[in-house]
Amino acid sequence: MIVEHAIDYIDYLMNYVDFTEKYFLLTIACVVFNPTWWNITARMEYKTKFMTKICGSKENGCYLLAFLIFSLGILRDWLFSEALIRQPIFQEFDRFEVEVLSYILYGFGGILVLAAYLKLGITGTYLGDYFGILMKERVTGFPFNVMNNPMYNGSVMLFIAHALSYKSVAGLVLSFVVYVVYKFALIFEESFTNYIYSTAAANAAKKNKSKSK
């Protein structure tokens, strides 16, 4: 009975989502494309150093990638906002509690993203390890002592907050798409990052061993 009611309510909510609207579809495309592109590009850089060669140094290569990722993020956020404007308004979200929740998510999500960026810096945030710019030690301070992947989690919170402030069920659907895509991206990013650091540690151990002979 509970499951049936839940399914019926989801069906009811979906009446407030225009799945054929252009900006809605473009937002999904951009959300999927962005991490797919930066993971492929970063792995190509790790294997071929093509951005390092083009830019003259690994730092400049990382800054270029950071600029491109940031620019794609702005495009994604703009498409998201444009999509919400064109979607039906869900009047049940026109409540004080929902407004307060959106403010809380804006605040906490923004703090997570900003604090993570300040801890990691440009190269730590934008895949500097793929360029050979490795962190000397694991970052353990706030917000990394609160949760794993605070930047991704904070970003999802900001999307949800924006959806609630626009009283948009479609915005929540898009936020869920962002969450799922980030989870998939992390599967590839975390495993390859571990590979980068384990390879670097093994190479360092070999050098130390050869020096001691």
From Swiss-Prot:
It catalyses: a 1,2-diacyl-sn-glycero-3-phospho-N-methylethanolamine + S-adenosyl-L-methionine = a 1,2-diacyl-sn-glycero-3-phospho-N,N-dimethylethanolamine + S-adenosyl-L-homocysteine + H(+); a 1,2-diacyl-sn-glycero-3-phospho-N,N-dimethylethanolamine + S-adenosyl-L-methionine = a 1,2-diacyl-sn-glycero-3-phosphocholine + S-adenosyl-L-homocysteine + H(+); a 1,2-diacyl-sn-glycero-3-phosphoethanolamine + S-adenosyl-L-methionine = a 1,2-diacyl-sn-glycero-3-phospho-N-methylethanolamine + S-adenosyl-L-homocysteine + H(+). Its main location: endoplasmic reticulum. Signal peptide: none annotated. It is found in: Endoplasmic reticulum membrane; Mitochondrion membrane. GO terms for molecular function: phosphatidyl-N-methylethanolamine N-methyltransferase activity; phosphatidylethanolamine N-methyltransferase activity. Pathway: Phospholipid metabolism; phosphatidylcholine biosynthesis. It is a multi-pass membrane protein. The chain crosses the membrane at residues 55-75, 103-123, 167-187. Its EC number is 2.1.1.17, 2.1.1.71. Residues 22-42 dip into the membrane without crossing it. Keywords: Endoplasmic reticulum, Lipid biosynthesis, Lipid metabolism, Membrane, Methyltransferase, Mitochondrion, Phospholipid biosynthesis, Phospholipid metabolism, S-adenosyl-L-methionine, Transferase, Transmembrane, Transmembrane helix. Residues 1-21, 43-54, 124-166 are lumenal. GO terms for cellular component: endoplasmic reticulum membrane; mitochondrial membrane. It comes from the Eukaryota. It holds the Pfam family PEMT. It is an enzyme of class 2 (transferase). S-adenosyl-L-methionine binds at G107, F108, G109, E189, E190. GO terms for biological process: methylation; phosphatidylcholine biosynthetic process. The keyword Ribosomal protein does not apply. Residues 76-102, 188-213 are cytoplasmic. InterPro entries: PEMT/MFAP (IPR024960), Phopholipid_MeTrfase (IPR007318). Catalyzes the three sequential steps of the methylation pathway of phosphatidylcholine biosynthesis, the SAM-dependent methylation of phosphatidylethanolamine (PE) to phosphatidylmonomethylethanolamine (PMME), PMME to phosphatidyldimethylethanolamine (PDME), and PDME to phosphatidylcholine (PC). Belongs to the class VI-like SAM-binding methyltransferase superfamily. PEMT/PEM2 methyltransferase family. PANTHER family: PHOSPHATIDYLETHANOLAMINE N-METHYLTRANSFERASE (PTHR15458:SF5). This is Phosphatidylethanolamine N-methyltransferase A.
